[in-house]
Regions:
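Basic, low-complexity intrinsically disordered segments
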Residues: 1-298
């Protein structure tokens, strides 16, 4: 079999297809590179691994530098990934070739599936996906959430909260770090913050005022989750988790439920974000609407 000519013809056809069918070019790229990867895999088994380098030299000369040895090896990796996972090209969650290039170095199957789903559902660019992988997003999920994802069980709002939350300090001096600074850093990159506590969030207000008796209290951050149809109270603490923090946030949650929430919305939830966890405090928290996580400064 003349593997080289077949590979070359697939790549030429793909380039021509992209010029007239721009809408479907990402899918066609993936299928073309998968088929090239399959041929490279078979050629390597027949002639040895060095054949890939030989093919790349010829392809660079005839079709351009984009088909160098490194790229061809990625195509071969793509085929091996599909083969190993026993995916059909039709049923696999097809994201872009660029996104697959970000995922190829990952070895863990559960992690691969997580990032593929993330890219597919959120229409992530390669740059955005790279950022999420680099932040070790999967590793920051709870073991309970990972098990749910593996067994395809439904996840709830708590399952999507990462631990720890990474807060960008923008290289500012944090010698005298306090809750006000923590809130400021979060607000400066609110989109990244909301991504780390799940999806479907909309920002309402910081320092949200509520009147308790004759005195105003202020909620650090008030969000709304469109997917779960509920308000979300966020309280920020720069210390270890304490029992009084739970009492405080429950008071705010109850206020929202009584005075703001409509009848067709779910009960308000609360998330305490603190410097250090204390599992013993949460053991005696009877309210399953209260969650906690920690933060680290980047």
């Amino acid at each position: 079999m003349n593997y080289y000519d077949k590979i070359k013809n697939i790549l030429i056809s793909n380039e021509a297809y992209k010029k007239v069918k721009d809408y479907y070019k990402n899918r066609n790229d993936l299928m073309s590179y998968y088929n090239v990867g399959k041929l490279l895999y078979e050629a390597g088994n027949t002639y040895g691994e060095s054949i890939i380098k030989s093919y790349s030299i010829k392809l660079v000369n005839e079709l351009g530098r984009k088909y160098n040895e490194r790229t061809l090896r990625k195509m071969r990796q793509l085929y091996i990934l599909f083969k190993k996972q026993k995916w059909s090209t039709a049923s696999a969650k097809l994201t872009t070739w660029s996104n697959y290039c970000e995922i190829l170095p990952i070895k863990d199957t559960s992690k691969i599936n997580y990032y593929l789903n993330l890219a597919y559902k959120n229409n992530l660019s390669a740059r955005e996906l790279r950022k999420r992988i680099k932040s070790k997003e999967y590793e920051r999920l709870s073991d309970e959430t990972k098990n749910k994802l593996i067994s395809n069980k439904e996840v709830n709002i708590k399952d999507n909260i990462l631990n720890p939350i990474i807060i960008n300090t923008f290289n500012k001096d944090i010698t005298k770090f306090n809750e006000k600074m923590l809130k400021e850093f979060i607000l400066n990159d609110i989109s990244s913050f909301m991504e780390q506590i799940g999806n479907g969030y909309s920002f309402i207000k910081d320092e949200y005022p509520i009147l308790l008796g004759d005195r105003y209290n202020y909620i650090d951050l008030l969000l709304y989750n469109i997917k779960f149809k509920c308000y979300v109270v966020i309280e920020l603490k720069v210390t270890e988790l304490k029992s009084e923090y739970i009492g405080q946030i429950k008071k705010y949650m109850n206020y929202i439920d009584k005075n703001i929430k409509s009848f067709d919305e779910d009960d308000t939830i609360g998330i305490i974000i603190c410097k250090k966890d204390n599992k013993f405090v949460m053991e005696y928290c009877s309210d399953d609407r209260v969650f906690r996580t920690t933060y680290i400064l980047n």
